[in-house]
Regions:
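Conserved, non-catalytic sequence blocks in retroelement Pol enzymes and Pol-derived host proteins
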Residues: 72-73, 94-97, 123-130, 189-196
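Mobile genetic element proteins and their domesticated derivatives, centered on retroelements
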Residues: 82, 104, 115, 120, ...
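Short Cys/His-based metal-binding microdomains
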Residues: 98-139
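Extended C-terminal regions of large enzymes
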Residues: 1-93, 99, 267
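Catalytic cores of nucleic-acid endonucleases
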Residues: 162-165, 177, 182-273
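Alpha-helical interaction elements in eukaryotic regulators
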Residues: 11-14, 25, 29, 75-78, ...
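Short amphipathic alpha-helices and their capping/turn residues within compact interaction modules
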Residues: 109-112, 143, 147, 172, ...
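Active-site metal-binding core of divalent-cation-utilizing nuclease and nuclease-like domains
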Residues: 95-100, 137-184, 198, 226
Length: 273
């Protein structure tokens, strides 16, 4: 065991901690050491300034990560592109060593992966398709559970201009109803999920009276749902899913559709496919 510890470069203090935190006495110590090394490397990855951007989001839903790493529903080409996106080594111009010009090949912004997947006009229609697919998956799941569901509902705000919400759901008009806004953004770390929820609540707050009046609803809550552009599912999304008893299949389909669409956006941007 000492030889193994030495070869793996595990310090005595680390080894002591591994032994103390090994909650399952039946688990082999070598397995506990592997877990420790994996978590250590993940932390090192998260600490990287560029390549670790948003990586901590991957730890929130390991089931989805496992499905992606097992290539479920993915072609070999898609899987390779996903690995490149996750490691921040996709062929975008802002990547160190790609060339002197880091400007986008379709606009004048710096061509980062986040720009390609979330902002560049080149992928506008594909991003809309990616979003609409997620919206429909969520709406159909609520329909399966016998909720009243409305998609792409137009409304008028207090300034008399038109707005549109993604999903309106309710079961009983006297109970709480919900405006749902799934939002796909590139994982950047921090409290993105909470920030999206706060942002959407503020954005739709002014139209709540309109929907109360039109649909005769007693109470409406706005929920902003953050989904990572690299197919990550957050703790907040999982809490939302379990609160409404939505299926894991829906969650898995959302993650798969998002990551496949992001691959398509990247390839369309870089290779005109």
């Amino acid at each position: 065991m000492e030889t193994c510890q030495e070869k793996l470069k595990i310090s005595n203090d680390e080894m002591k901690k591994i032994v103390e935190t090994n909650k399952n006495p039946k688990k082999k110590l070598t397995q506990a050491m592997r877990i420790h090394l994996r978590e250590k490397e993940f932390k090192n990855w998260c600490d990287l300034k560029s390549k670790g951007k948003g990586v901590e989001t991957f730890k929130d839903c390991k089931e989805v990560n496992k499905r992606i790493m097992e290539k479920r529903g993915l072609t070999n080409t898609e899987w390779i592109q996903i690995l490149k996106m996750n490691g921040q080594v996709a062929p975008v111009r802002a990547l160190h060593g790609r060339g002197q010009d880091n400007r986008c090949r379709h606009c004048d912004e710096i061509e980062t992966l986040g720009h390609v997947l979330g902002f560049c006009d080149r992928g506008y229609l594909l991003r809309n398709t990616r979003h609409n697919t997620v919206r429909t998956l969520i709406a159909d799941e609520f329909r399966r559970l016998k909720w009243n569901v409305y998609e792409e509902v137009h409304c008028i705000n207090p300034s008399r201009s038109t707005q549109r919400i993604d999903i309106l759901i309710y079961k009983n008009k006297n109970d709480k109803s919900y405006i749902l806004d799934p939002t796909i953004r590139f994982e950047a770390g921090g409290n993105q999920s909470e920030d999206v929820n706060i942002e959407k609540k503020a954005h739709y707050d002014s139209v709540i009276p309109y929907f109360k009046e039109k649909y005769k609803l007693a109470d409406i809550e706005v929920i902003g749902l953050f989904i990572g552009a690299r197919g990550t599912i957050t703790v907040d999304f999982e809490n939302f899913r379990t609160k409404f008893d939505l299926s894991k299949e829906m969650r898995n389909n959302i993650a798969l559709s998002v990551i496949k669409s992001s691959v398509q956006i990247l390839q369309h941007h870089t290779y005109n496919l």
